[in-house]
């Protein structure tokens, strides 16, 4: 498989503890594995951090940060973007899933056709 460079996956979250595990697992199941997952919490009122913590401990590519105050979706995404180290940026909400070959197919298409994320 080609290496297209690091993909920074931005996952904004707010009170998605019941769903975020499946989201994380769908990222870990990607056939393209050169990624970092930046979970940016907008001051969740549930146990999102406790749910995410075991994934961070097992996979150093998963990083979590919480906004200082509840700020809304745009600020939350922008805060994560400032931390991104990847050549590519992808967004995945914390209650959504990706098919296993999503990144691989998308990157291949974009590189072959001269597109950017």
Mark where each language-model region is:
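Nucleotide-sugar donor-binding/catalytic module of glycosyltransferases
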Residues: 1-117
